[in-house]
């Protein structure tokens, strides 16, 4: 929202903004039409006319996610509104035409996330590697290689013959005898790599991991094949030495020139386990790596309604449309006041009622930063924010940061390079969130710098400082910096002077990477479970009297809470399915707003947990196109496999209907069409029975922004 609108908001009713919106729409100025419609909704959030004009304006601007959101909000107000129903149908047609023009219906490609995953060595791995090496040398007495020697050709031939005998014994199932024969062969020819590899395999089968690994370590590095390096990775992982396991898998991957997908996959499985293991220790889940990337699996059966796990954000920021609702800028706690909740009528309450509210309303401990641009629920949050990131982007310490908070206050509007006011920040979440990511990195790098008594962070310091953001994938290759030039330059200026002579250079590559890292992983959430109203009701418990009864009647309306976007490390590993089996809800984690991942359908041990990134009530073709556009994958879930795209093509066999005919739909769900009764029966058995009339999850999906992405924005997920 522009400054001009902010100045007058509150002095006009919703109808004033609505009239302005309609006027701008009629003139073709859809940006201003959308801006005024949003302003009307801020004043009167159940104004259905404002929802409609906002949806229309967003559609004209090709902001399809926003358009869909406003129409859905309108249907919440009036589920039978014919105008919205018709315009939603039109929106679906526009969406499909738009995606078709972009080539979105191109052939679906096979996808394997391992191609986009880094095997970079982590900064802290050097120390861990040395620690594991000491364990290998002292506990397992491993020798790195055999001493140089010359083997008698006769002995070498003798060893080969013994090895052939060992193979025959293996076929007979005599593993122990086969191991003995391998040992005899190695006594004759200690350099026989085949014998060492075979004995290692046999010892692993017997559970003798240490002996197996000793044979592999004895093989000179230059003689180790891809299979040997890969086998060593398996053994080291079994011994609980993940950094060495990664080292061996990395060698296998490099030696195979990335052709051995199994080695690359096993590397990522080890990495996922060591990164996420500590986070899942108290939950009935584990994080694994599949061809679709990091995934979460149940370790025991879970019933509907159970909480699979809780998560708290690494970094957060408000959604811009909630920027004026009071909340802690660090933890997202509601800072709702009596005046905000009860509105103008609060001043009309009689003295006893106001006195009771004042007495029982939770104590306000909120504090503001001296810059007056951030507010916190208490001094603890203020101190945490200061130590973690805020001192880098506080306008009182960094003069360039004023522009950042102005951009937030104006809901993404600012001056472009030509001095014209327009929307220069398109995403729904605040640009402050993006700035906090860099500020967190800078603060940690400076802390490490001071710890080592240096005046500048080293390369290692910067690498370690990025650890907290390591768990979040990045995908998207379009140049966002060129699409948001004003914000890109703003961030460069802000971090050109981070105090103490330290600066952080934000290149286009860095800007794009962090933008996508945020945009692809954000989840919306709020403090809806813990507001001052909840505190008031708790404090009123046991308080009797007429005034209390009156107050209780006045507190039946749900309080307005600010919605935030947060990056949650465990949650970020959840994959999507349109027939999701978990849903994301607001929760309290360690006393602060966070998210709960609640079971939506019964799970068995070993089942993968799936959330939904979008509104799954959309038609199949639109769902899949939207997911491809936003996340660069074609959904292959059961709902997408066994729902159809329309009456012109058989959902089961793909046969097209004749030009003047249409196929019959499923009589129950009406979302699948069949050319014959036989096809319908086949589809039912294959899987349609599982999704026919399957309940949709109506919980808020991921906070995604698709306006700056296109179908060529990424070739898959990449770990950053």
What are these regions (language model features)?
Residues 1-49, 53-720:
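Short alpha-helical interaction motifs and adjacent low-complexity tails used for partner binding
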